Swiss-Prot record:
It comes from Lactobacillus gasseri (strain ATCC 33323 / DSM 20243 / BCRC 14619 / CIP 102991 / JCM 1131 / KCTC 3163 / NCIMB 11718 / NCTC 13722 / AM63). InterPro entries: ATP-cone_dom, NrdR-like_N, RNR_NrdR-like. PANTHER family: TRANSCRIPTIONAL REPRESSOR NRDR (PTHR30455:SF2). A zinc finger (unnamed) spans 3-34. This is Transcriptional repressor NrdR. Binds 1 zinc ion. The keyword DNA-binding applies. Keywords: ATP-binding, DNA-binding, Metal-binding, Nucleotide-binding, Repressor, Transcription, Transcription regulation, Zinc, Zinc-finger. Coiled coil: none annotated. Residues 49-139 form the ATP-cone domain.
Length: 154
């Protein structure tokens, strides 16, 4: 690894440990040329994931957009930020498990709704009202009936 101080390619690892909840490895290095110590991180490089929007355009997957959407739906609900982070992790992991390079925004929305339905009914309905773009009360009532039918099965 190149030393950021003297730019020579001679360094050795003097310490290595897990970081970022085991998603990275933190390595402490020392340059064998000048003795400068520096830190590097090693992470798994995931293949880029593209989202196919409703208009057919493509954009890079952005977990922060999903997190923002579920945070808006969960406003003033007894849901912690950790629960929302976990929800978004589940959605992203489910997408990556499918092994696809592209996924439609509709499929992402369905995954989010599935996760929200298991977390909080009100947040689910709020998210569904925006995601499904209800045109009238009947669409909203249909989502409510779906939620109530789910509870009847439990």
């Amino acid at each position: 690894m190149e030393c950021p101080n003297c730019h020579k390619n001679a360094s050795r690892v003097i310490d290595s440990r897990p970081s970022d909840e085991n998603r990275a490895i933190r390595r402490r290095r020392e340059c064998e040329n000048c003795g400068f110590r520096f830190t590097t991180f090693e992470r798994v490089e995931r293949s880029p994931l593209l989202v196919i929007k409703n208009d057919g355009t493509r954009e890079a997957f952005n977990r922060d957009k999903i997190l923002h959407g579920v945070m808006m739906a969960a406003q003033k609900r007894p849901i912690s930020s950790e629960q929302l982070d976990t929800l978004v992790d589940h959605v992203e992991n489910e997408i990556r498990k499918q092994g696809l390079n592209e996924i439609s925004s509709k499929d992402i929305g369905n995954l989010v709704m599935k996760e929200l339905a298991n977390l909080d009914d009100v947040a689910y309905i709020r998210f569904a009202s925006i995601y499904r773009q209800f045109k009238d009360v009947s669409g909203f009532m249909e989502a409510m009936e779906d939620m109530m039918a789910k509870h009847d099965k439990e």
